[in-house]
Amino acid sequence: IMPGSGINKTNIVNVISPEGAYIVHENVVLIESAVGNGQIDFGEDLELLLIAENVGVDGASNINATVTSSDPYVTIENGDILFDFIGPGLTSDSNNSINISIATSVPDLHPITFDIQYSNGTDTWESSFNLNAHAPVFEIANPVVHDENQDGIWDPGESATILIDLINSGSSDFHYPTASMVSNSDYIEVTTDDNTNTFYVIFSGSTYQGEFQLNSDAETPDGTIASLT
């Protein structure tokens, strides 16, 4: 595991022939056009530049490689890459990169497995690697009710403001999120303006405060428990 990179290298024991070339995956470089934070994030389109290693005893040239994945959270737009020549014991960057798209619904820290098949027209070698996807995870905590007359009791017919901690406990920032509240009670109306709880960004590991305005109906029975979503 490369700390902080989100890239896992799978431990695979390869039985190497005492002659000829043998190509394996060595590393991958993320090429990002948007966030540029060195990790693959939910909803991101990016390129992958692959690095291959020849652990055999002979060089290999004109190596075509095809990258695939059966993971439902990634789409590979063009998975074919080329290596001109890899000498024995050496590594080489691919001539071109592959384009991938990460689903917005990917769970935080979900490992995505990519399979690679290398071929020089005579021999074929198979390898794989994992990338961890990153996404925000939202939680709410510490609701505080401020009633209109500030006596600590939310009375029938009274307005109130609820302050709630909005927590992003995931490993990815979330830009332009909006927090909204829905009342599941016939006696409570949410009156907050739609744009009140729109943020530029909620960073990973950060807490922001949401503010919501509500009104209780004048006919609200005493002791009513209001369900809010």
Language-model features and meaning:
Residues 1-20, 99-137, 215-229:
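Terminal connector regions
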Residues 26-36, 142-150:
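Short, solvent-exposed loop/edge segments of extracellular or virion-exposed proteins
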Residues 35-44, 150-158:
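Short, solvent-exposed loop/linker segments at the N-terminal edge
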Residues 49-53, 66-68, 97, 101, ...:
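Residue-level recognition of well-ordered beta-strand positions that form the cores
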Residues 51-74, 79-81, 167-188, 193:
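Short acidic, flexible loop segments centered on an aromatic residue
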Residues 75-106, 188-220:
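Intrinsically disordered, low-complexity Pro/Gly/Ser/Thr-rich segments with frequent PxxP/GP/PP motifs
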